[in-house]
């Protein structure tokens, strides 16, 4: 048994791509399985990663032995919840910030939650972001969206965040259908 931690495309040190659709990200996961010669795996995905592993159920269900989706539902959220975050990230990109401390100072002009700032700063290294900001902004409708896929007929664990708006009773039918 082993664990493979995947940075999704346009995040961390993963390859950059102009496309951020869930079918494309599911293919990335399948390519990762193939690259590591893994026939079947249990997938645990958080947020966008959770949607990517759900999309994998439509692409290669035979390769999935278990699925856990954390703080995400298989729905189109129709809401831009992250505009303030993008504003903070862009402000840092346009500033002369070269350290996390300087970047945090710029971000506090746009964001109130220190936990969110510190989480984002994990991806600020050597004066630059480790995610592809222009593509994430451009592809945002695909990231918050969701195309209905066939139900995966195996148990799936959905874990909501404590005060999260992403897994609520309003999405119960979508969770049961997935």
Q: Where in this protein do the model-derived segments appear?
A:
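Conserved serine/cysteine hydrolase catalytic core
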Residues: 126-178
């Amino acid at each position: 048994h082993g664990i493979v931690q995947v940075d999704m495309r346009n995040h961390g040190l993963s390859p950059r791509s102009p496309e951020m659709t869930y079918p494309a990200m599911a293919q990335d996961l399948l390519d990762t399985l193939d690259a590591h010669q893994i026939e079947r795996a249990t997938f645990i995905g958080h947020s966008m990663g959770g949607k990517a592993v759900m999309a994998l159920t439509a692409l290669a269900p035979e390769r999935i032995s278990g699925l856990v989706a954390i703080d995400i539902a298989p729905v189109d959220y129709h809401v831009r919840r992250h505009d303030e975050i993008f504003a903070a990230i862009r402000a840092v990109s346009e500033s002369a910030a070269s350290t996390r401390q300087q970047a945090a100072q710029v971000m506090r002009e746009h964001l109130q939650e220190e936990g969110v700032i510190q989480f984002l700063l994990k991806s600020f290294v050597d004066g630059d972001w480790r995610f592809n900001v222009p593509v994430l902004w451009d592809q945002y409708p695909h990231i918050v969206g969701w195309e209905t896929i066939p139900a995966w007929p195996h148990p799936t664990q959905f874990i909501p965040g404590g005060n999260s708006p992403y897994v609520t009773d309003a999405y119960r039918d979508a969770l049961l259908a997935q």
